[in-house]
């Protein structure tokens, strides 16, 4: 279905789909969702979209602990899953990049932030490599805006952001030829949602869930699509 013509689910519609399936006893389709934020409604949207595409199995999505992305990826290896969804956001690489921890920001911390992100990126790559040996993976890169961390005007390119993007590019280069890891294209997201149309600060502060519902529905549909459509074999 053409993305521009696609009708996206409301939260109520997603919950109705999930609840209908709970009444049926069918073979399970287990998925693990690794993220550092509280996934809440994004889990519901992903589960509902995936459920509609595989009606003969009951989709179950489990998630891990708050604020421990890398630990959650490792946790996924304790059980067997049909698919592993990994969603990185900047606070997963350094909590100081998140709204909840940004009150103590000082520009003198920039060097330390970069070093922390670099170490976490290396650890992330290692965990993804390990997990991919046993389960197919969908990897989504940071989708939310970061707050200005420079005295420069916000429309000018910042050194920190350039280095952060470079580290994510390193992850992309590592897995771009992998038949086990699919990666959501950040530019595809940009075509449909601006950074600030994705973010709900009030929800993040109250519940640890940082997304607007329309964007969560859009992202859940993408996640479901990557699971039900196998990655093409490399070189073909």
Give the positions of each predicted feature.
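Extracellular glycan-modifying ectodomains
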Residues: 1-236
């Amino acid at each position: 279905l053409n993305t521009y013509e696609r009708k996206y689910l409301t939260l109520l519609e997603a919950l109705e789909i999930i609840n209908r399936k709970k009444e049926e006893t069918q073979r399970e389709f287990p998925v693990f969702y690794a993220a550092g934020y509280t996934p809440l409604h994004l889990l519901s949207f992903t589960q509902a979209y995936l459920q509609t595409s595989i009606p003969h199995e009951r989709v179950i999505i489990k998630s891990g602990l708050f604020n421990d992305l890398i630990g959650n990826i490792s946790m996924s290896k304790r059980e067997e899953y049909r698919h592993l969804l990994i969603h990185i956001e900047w606070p997963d690489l350094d909590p100081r990049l998140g709204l909840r921890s940004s009150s103590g920001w000082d520009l003198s911390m920039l060097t330390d932030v970069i070093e922390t992100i670099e170490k976490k990126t290396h650890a992330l790559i290692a965990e993804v490599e390990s997990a991919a040996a046993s389960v197919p993976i969908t990897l989504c890169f940071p989708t939310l805006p970061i707050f200005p961390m420079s005295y420069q005007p916000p429309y000018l390119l910042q050194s920190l952001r350039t280095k952060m993007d470079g580290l994510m590019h390193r992850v992309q280069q590592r897995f771009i030829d992998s038949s086990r890891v699919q990666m959501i294209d950040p530019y595809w997201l940009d075509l449909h949602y601006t950074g600030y149309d994705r973010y709900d600060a009030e929800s993040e502060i109250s519940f640890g869930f940082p997304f607007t519902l329309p964007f969560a529905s859009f992202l859940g549909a993408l996640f479901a699509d990557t699971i039900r459509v196998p990655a093409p074999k490399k070189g073909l």
